[in-house]
Amino acid sequence: MSIDGQTDSRMPRYSFAGDPVTYVVPTLIDLDELGFRLARAARASGIPLETTVVISNGALPYSTSVHNHLGNDGKIITIGMSYYDFDRVRQRAEVVQDLSDEVVGKAVFLLDEVVDRGGTMPVAIDHILTSGARSVHTGALIFKRRSVFVPDFVGESIDDEWVVFPHDIRPSIERISSKWRDLGVNEAEIRTRFHRLFERAPHLVEQVIHYHSLVPA
């Protein structure tokens, strides 16, 4: 069961001249709302809910909220997944940090902040089941429709858009700044674009401008 097809998104899309990418910038309020939607659907489905496992690092900032909305007991368990081996991209995701606690006999709810291409969760599910879990159900705050894997529960589905998460400001700004400069966008226009991107989260503007200023011209 998923809650795909939501039409009441509060997250506007942003596009800019000369840049083919569409950006989505969820606020902390948006993400808490998506976590609540996801958890409410999971609880209503009647699946067994006992233990939350979160894929680190991306989902960690939102895991406590979802864990509490689910009504799961005990501490949150983490598992580290990655496609990267230093500067080399692996063919498939691998477990790079084992489960932080035992899951033997547990009904696990596996959480990630975004499912993009869908290669991470299946590997994590296999590892959790091999580690003795009784069952695994999955949830993602944001799901990209291009993914080959569909989680059981989804906060919101989007197209192939660049999601800038609040926890990911520095690396996102560094990449976007470099990209826009390479496209020939002047500094004044870059600042204007960033102000537009983060108009719904004005407390982040100072961070954005600071990190942009650190990117070599």
Map each language-model feature to its residues:
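PRPP-associated nucleotide enzymes
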Residues: 1-217
